[in-house]
Amino acid sequence: KEPHAVLLIYKEAQVVDGVAMDDVLFVQERDPLREQWDGYRLGIAGAKEKLGFPNVFFNTQFTDFKTDFNRFDQVLFFDFNNDVRDDVRNNADLFSLINSFKEKTNFPLDFNVEKTSLYRYITTSDTNSSANVAQVLSRSLRTNKDLAKDALLAAYQSAINERQRAELKQQMSAQITNLNSQTLPMIMDGLREIKLPEEVELLKKAIYISAVGQVEVMKAMYPDMSEREIQGIHEFVFKKYGAEYEGYPSIVGGGHNGCVLHYITNDKPIVGSDLVLMDLGAEYHNYTADVTRTIPSDGTFSAEQRAIYDIVYEAQEAGIAASVVGAGMRAPHYAAVEVIVKGLKALGIIQDASEVRKYFPHGTSHYLGLDVHDAGTYSPFQHNTLITVEPGIYIPENSPCDPKWWGIAVRIEDDILITNDGPINLSAYAPRTPDGIEAMMREPSVLDAFVLP
């Protein structure tokens, strides 16, 4: 919401014009004319008041700001996208700010983070590590075409003695800069993986709003509804409860459409008597939920629908139970897969565990936070990690099983906060048992009397 900005964070306080600074933020100037067209800007005063940064300057001041980047041991930054366009009328747009940063850091035209990382690894390794270096280098050159073209790396790989390798290390050292675009993303992954208490509260709000949407649709659903109408009810609830956006494109798939994992067309005019898979999440103050329910449009599961639903529900229960501190990111998936394999075998839909990916082709969990698929380290779960648990079974038409199963798609997704006291289902407000869903669908809806001309 505040584009064309730069944030500098120092590991140790830097003195600039007699002021000690831990961080510096550069933002756009207030401009009544542009704000009339594009919306309110924070400016310096707003950034200090609302964001809490004590040292704020206009972005036009970044070019001349007195920071010698070359004297730092490392300058950590995110890789730049190549699609940033230059607004020639703005000398402090993102394009210009990136160029100013590159000038300040003597950014090489041929900067390659993988090459720099490999140079650094080779030059800091001693002779006792030669075998490991050779393996890493060989794998890197084999899998990265750009690295394979590098003369120094190719020469190092073919060097026949330590004297040659030592000379090549010196040449590599001369080309290593203090620029590092690998470490900062890893640091941010760790910060985003473990939620602060304040973040948990915002996520609880986003998740609750999303669960309310599911509940209201359960009450309002009837077979003559369109997928887009169902989507509209969800998103109306989001806005009614203060969510600024949807966290991702809304998925409402009736019948066979539910077998398309990221189905966002939502254009089926009548859902009929099919199951309706609804995967939607409200975004509240930049934090997004991700909640999925699958419900029968006529209010009652058929025998076949319920048989599949029961397997997915049991798989989700196993996945949630596996979401504990110390477990690996794949633990919920392994638990869910075991249940789904057993269930599909019992129904005769598969004969062997190797067939399960035909009907359960995705993972069970991902991190949740500022993004619907949030960043994380994929290390063992810690207290206040927030993940989804979302097993599913999808049986497209013409699948190699009894046609009575064709077109059934079920996914149940909840947002699980992992704590030292066990997993907490933050989206439990929306019923997920088949009996609970059917009972909710019998409840009256505030939309029953809402008739448009």
Tell where the protein language model's regions lie, with residue ranges.
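Active-site neighborhoods and metal-handling regions in enzymes and metal-associated proteins
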Residues: 1-453
